[in-house]
Amino acid sequence: MSPEIPPEWKKFRYRGKSLEDLLNMPMDEFIKLLPSRQRRSLKRGFSDKQRRLLEKIRKISREGKQNKVIKTHVRNMVILPEMVGLRFAVYNGKEFVEFQVVPEMIGRYLGEYSITTKKVEHGEPGLKATKSSLFLAMKG
């Protein structure tokens, strides 16, 4: 991440730690701050896909391409402090849903911001869909 942190992010605190503290903190200490599910997930280590994504994130951060969208299918990656400010496009099974990581997302999963299902919007029932709809056709 670039050394310049926006002023609105300086007020952010995660479990009593500022964003700067989280960025400078070793991974072992950061893991202790996470909720149990995320903590256990990270203690097991990263999968190959997660490791490749992390390498890609670090490469983009080093090059200073903060606005480049990182496309991924890895929904089970925990959002780490070094991901703040980056843009991701996470696959939801049909398309890539794009979003920017803000400090409030730390400790959550990438998949939480790419919803896989959409709200069902029922239309009018079709002809013969219900027993009463048989009589609607006769009326009209």
UniProtKB/Swiss-Prot annotation:
Pfam families linked: Ribosomal_S19
Keyword set, alphabetical order: Ribonucleoprotein, Ribosomal protein, RNA-binding, rRNA-binding
GO cellular component terms listed in the entry, alphabetical order: cytosolic small ribosomal subunit
InterPro entries cross-referenced by the UniProt entry: Ribosomal_uS19, Ribosomal_uS19_CS, Ribosomal_uS19_euk/arc, Ribosomal_uS19_SF
GO biological process terms held by the UniProt record: ribosomal small subunit assembly; translation
This protein's record includes keyword Secreted: no
Gene Ontology terms, MF aspect: rRNA binding; structural constituent of ribosome
Sequence similarity: Belongs to the universal ribosomal protein uS19 family.
UniProt cross-references to PANTHER family, sorted A to Z: RIBOSOMAL PROTEIN S19P FAMILY MEMBER, SMALL RIBOSOMAL SUBUNIT PROTEIN US19
Reported function: Protein S19 forms a complex with S13 that binds strongly to the 16S ribosomal RNA.
HAMAP family: Ribosomal_uS19
Name by which UniProt lists this protein: Small ribosomal subunit protein uS19
